Design a protein with these regions (language model features):
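Noncatalytic, basic helical substrate-engagement surface that gates or grips nucleic-acid strands
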Residues: 1-80, 85-96, 100-105, 187-190, ...
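Non-catalytic nucleic-acid-binding/docking modules located in mid-to-C-terminal regions
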Residues: 3, 70-73, 102-241
């Protein structure tokens, strides 16, 4: 069972929330031109494709993981991405991440080991330390270590006390950290919201629809002609039609 999500357009509703959010303006036109072709190839391979416009591809995968993980027919859900925002989706060993670059599977214990907090605190962590890949600046002086130290104790940004003298954990430069957070707490909460993946994308497919039954010969032949690679047809081991 496979689903593939794409940012059909790179802008999303998050750009309306924050002007600095990623836009794709730095993506080379030659790369952008390949996006529609890749979507067509995925569909021709017989995969379920979710092309996102208002939401992001990450939201589609988070929604699918949330929707299908309780299904007793599902043994495990593997999100094939090393992106740290997906860590918030991990649940025990039932919903895990696959870092294909390092060929590593990250379960809930792995999230704690890698980021210092549980999955539920990942949006807070990114809200504090920022996420340059998504254009989230974070709060000055709040790096991963200090953010994880406080969130391991308090779980959420909202729960971090304003007075650093009342913190029950030690953090280097606590006074400065507190001053920066208190002067930008609203911004931190906005960044947290930006980093929170949506689990309510209106996906219409059922678990049965996600079952891979083979590539679609006609569709793939058309794409192969377009890109000038007939060899792709020879590499297909299973056809749906």
């Amino acid at each position: 069972h496979v689903g593939v999500a794409f940012d059909h357009v790179i802008r999303s509703y998050r750009n309306d929330m924050f002007d600095g959010y990623k836009t794709g303006d730095d993506v080379e036109p030659e790369i952008l031109a390949q996006f529609p072709i890749v979507e067509r190839v995925a569909a021709a391979l017989g995969l379920v494709v979710w092309p996102m416009v208002e939401f992001e591809a990450d939201d589609a995968l988070a929604t699918a993981a949330t929707r299908f993980s309780p299904d007793p027919r599902v043994d495990q859900i593997i999100i094939c991405s090393p992106d740290k925002d997906f860590a918030q989706c991990v649940r025990g060993q039932r919903v895990v991440l696959h870092d294909r670059i390092r060929d590593r599977v990250i379960d809930e214990e792995g999230v704690h080991e890698k980021w210092g907090v549980g999955p539920g605190s990942i949006p807070d962590l990114l809200g504090l330390m920022g996420d340059t890949a998504d254009g989230i600046p974070g709060i000055p002086r709040w790096g991963q270590k200090s953010s994880a130290t406080l969130l391991a104790e308090y779980q959420t940004i909202e729960s971090i006390p304003a007075d650093p003298d009342s913190w029950s954990v030690k953090a280097r430069g606590a006074k400065g950290l507190s001053e920066n957070l208190e002067s930008q707490r609203e911004a931190a909460l906005l960044y947290k919201e930006l980093a929170t993946l949506r689990c309510d994308v209106p996906l219409t497919e059922s678990i049965e629809d996600l079952e891979w039954r083979g590539a679609r010969r006609g569709l793939l032949a058309d794409v192969a002609d377009e890109i000038g690679d007939q060899g792709i047809l020879e590499r297909i081991e299973r056809w749906r039609d």
